[in-house]
Structure formats: structure tokens, C-alpha cells
Amino acid sequence: MVMLWTIIAMKRFLRFYKKAYECKCKIIPVAINRECRLPQKEIEKKQSFDVWEQLRCRSLDENYMPTVAKIFARKIISMVLPTLYCESGEIFLSHRRIDGEEITAKLYDKIAVMAKEATPFRDVINVKVGEDAQAVIDLEMEKSDVFVFLHTPKSGESDWVLKELRFALLRNIPILWVKIDDADEKKLRIKPSDSAHLSFNSVDFEDEQKLISIVDNILDKSFELIMNRSMQSLEYSEMLREIFGEKVSVYDEQEMIYHISMDRKGYHYPQRNIEQYYQIYGRNPNMKDACRLSDLLKDRELDSIAILTNKILSYSRKDEVSLDSIEDFYYHWSNYLGKFERGNKNMEIVVSGAFPDADEIYKQSLTDALILFAKAIIRDGYELTFGSHPTFQELFFEIAKEECPADYKNKINMYISNWFLNDNEEEANRLRNNCSLYISEKKEDRTMSLTQMRKHMIQRKNVKALVCLGGKIRTNKTEEGIREEINLAKQENIPVFVVGSVGGCSSKVAKEYKETGWSELNSASSELNDKFYDDIDYYNMAQEMLKFLDEMV
């Protein structure tokens, strides 16, 4: 319950307060101006949300009340949905020192003033003298709730910036891309989205009022990205319930805490059940979260406690609580329960993806989906095949190296037309160091060259399925690459799965096939195709598809 603290008739207030108290509401006084900063006697011990102080920190007047309202809303969300959002989350500032250090310093200092609960990270400030700088940076990146990429003109040339971008993408950390001046997007080997979320001139950081506006924009966009990513975690609870069935029960629905009581396997004599509790987080869990959960369950008879997140974490333990990613938790339990079967190692699944035309925040859903599908495909024993894409190829290479470090080249097949490679043997050798490379013939024009490459990539006996995501929508449908790839697959009776929820051309195609009952696309159930149409649980989607393909004769 929120109390806007102006002059209120006392009787009305007391009735209201009594009712709120009886309902066990959390009462938050709001001091609208300097004269009303002390709450009434009944709630004088409660700390107020100070509107005047929020305005003062930003050098703003009362015309900027909507800005403060957004800040207040984030505070309320952190209280009501503590597993999805935390005000004190870490904001990692990624930059190149040679041309980004000064603006990063100004940004860091202003965030520290305007968002006092937040934890910004800047290597020069947060890495102590004598520490292993890269080890600290790697740890802080993994802990971060949002990754702010300050794209200055020289940052695209930095291998360190490339490493940080790759790390954030593969760890499912929301990335806010902030373009500075005329930074060239073409120099980025990895792009977090199709284009930058925000753009500013470096001189804007010299102006106090403009700097305040920049910080507010960054905080607003960061919040949107964090919540968009966090809300995806809600989908995972159903996926885990499906694998555990009646063996899982709800311990606390609001806190997303669940209890597994599972039969033990692999021993001749009777044993007690495995008793495990897990809690799902959308944000990055920390030591306080682990301690709180451990304390909450201290009187329960159990074997283990796990905090799970939809970010990709390195497995760790804090206060006897295991911190792990949801997909790894699912993977290990699936192995234990015998529900995970390796596919035919000589078969491939082709993944076709391109950024759609949409708000930059939601384009990251495509990258998330591609990463989750790629991991699931390789883990299931299939080879991942794709047509060259300058952004996604680096991600696929890294995923293969993580999943199969000893044999990663044989897990990735990349097709490229010589129209784009143009007999560049140096680039071809670089690609061969990361994958099995197939170069198709250069034709008379770009369109014909792409068609030739797509035929070579898709129309082969060892292609098990085609997965389509995103893509640009064209006025002339024949120019849409996804439609051509689907037709090529259908000619060979190769099952096609179209992910609609990432937007773009695949959303249009999925809608068209849904209206015809998914005829000619694949022989999977309407239920599975409907999931591909509008669901956002991409990991579960991939698992369901792989289960269907593994069971195909």
C-alpha cells in the first residue's frame, strides 16, 4: 500500500491505515515536498520515499514528477517481486579506455548519485590495486544484472570489448547498447542487437542537465531489459513441473519455491527419497538470497537447496545453497530420470535466424532463442548447421566450444556463398578453425547466390529439421529468405518449425500456417506447433522439438 503524504483528513487516514494494517499491507509513506517529509505519528518510524530528494539528485523541478514516479515504481516492483528485480543490482559499464574512459567516469559518478541503491561497476574504480584485473572483471560480469555497452568509435576494434559482449550474450545477461558519436556498427564482430538502443554525442556528457537525462534514459532502458528477461523465468516453472510431474509440489508460489520428492535410482535396497527444494529467480541471485532461503528452510528435512536463474551461471555454492542455471538444472535432472536421449550424431538441424524489424529491446529475444536452441541441439547429439551470419556465427562457435571442447569443429556446419567470401582464403581459414565450412558457388547476382547456398545447406539427406526465427518482412514475399528455405525443406519432406514470438517474418509465416492447421510444415502435434507460434519459453520449446525428432522413425 502506498500513502501519498499530503494533508489528509485524520479520521479518513486512521480508518484507511487501520484497514491496511489489518490486511498486513506494507505501508510506504511518500513525502511529496520538503514541508511534508515527516510521516504522521502512526507511521513516523517508517522511512518515506522522498520525492524532493529524488528531484534534487537530478537537479529537476516539479515538472519532472513523471521521472520520479518511474523510480518509485521500480522500488515497489523490487518489493513485490523480489525474485525478479532488485534495486541494488549491478550495472556493468563496458567501455574502451582509449576513447571511452572520461564519459564512463561521468556516467559512473552520476549513477552513484541518482540511483544510490544500484551498484555500478567500472574497472578502474572497482578493481583493487594488486588484484587480478581480468579475474575480477569476469566475476563482476557474471554477477551483473545488466550490461551497458558504451560503443565508442574505437571500441569495435577491441578484443576485450568483443570478449565482454560475447560473455554477456552467452550468459543471457541483458545488454543495453549505447552508441556514442559516429561509432561504426560494421566494425563490431558481435552485435547485441540489430542497432543501438540509445545514441548520444560525447559532448552531451559535458552538460550537467543532458548527463542527468542520459542517466535516466539508461536506467529506464536497463529496467525494461531486466524485467523483460526476468519475466521469461516465469515460463520455466511449468517446464520443470512437466519433468517432475506429481513428484514436485509448491512450497511458496509467490516466492517461486518448489519441493521435489523423487525416488532414488540405481540401488538394490530401499532408500529414502531425494528431497530437494529449488527457487526460481529472474534476476541475478546473490549471497543474501542464498542465506535467506537457507534460513527459511532450516527446519526442513532435505538433501539440497538450489537457486535457479535463467542466466547462465557457473555452478557455485553459497551458504549450502547451490546456484545454477535453470537449463543446467533441467539437463542434469533429465539425465538422472532417463528422459534425455542422444540423437543420431550424423544428423543435422538447420537453424535460420535474422533480426526482425522491432524495438531493439525485444530483438534480444531472437538472440536468446538462438542461443538456447543451439545449446539444446548440440547437447542432444545433433550437429548445428546454419548459413553465414556475421553476428550469430561467433555465438555459435563459442557455444560449440563450451559444449564440446574436444570436438567443437565437427558440431558446427557453416554454409557461405562465395558471393560474400569472394575467394578470401584468409577469412576461409579463420572460419575453418571454428567449424566445418562449406562454400557454395558464386552466381550471377546476390539473390541467385543465396538460393544456391540455401539449396546446398538444406536439401540433403542428413538434415533432420529446419528451425526458422525472425527475418525481415518484405513487400515482395519472394524476397523473404525464410519462405525460400521453408519451401526447399518441404520439397525434401524435412520437418520445419517456425518460432513466431521473436517477431519478424517468422511471426507472419507462423500465423499463416496456424490458420491452415499447420499442414505441410511437419507431422508434429498442433500443441507443439502452437508453442512455437506464441510461447516465449524457448528452452522448453527446443526440448519438445528434439523429443519429437528423436521419436521419428
Regions found by a protein language model. Give the residues of each.
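Conserved BB-loop
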Residues: M1, T6-A9, Y108-D138, P153-V161, ...
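Conserved beta-strand-loop-alpha-helix hinge of the TIR/SEFIR fold
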Residues: M1-R37, I98, I137-K187, S261-D319, ...
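Short, highly selective alpha-helical patches that border small-molecule cofactor pockets
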Residues: F13, G100, T104-Y108, L370, ...
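C-terminal interaction surface of TIR/SEFIR-family domains
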Residues: A31-A112, D181-G343, S523-V553
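A short acidic (Asp/Glu
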Residues: Q40-K41, I103-A105, D159-V161, L188, ...
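Short, hydrophobic/glycine-enriched beta-strand segments
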Residues: I91-H95, K345-P356
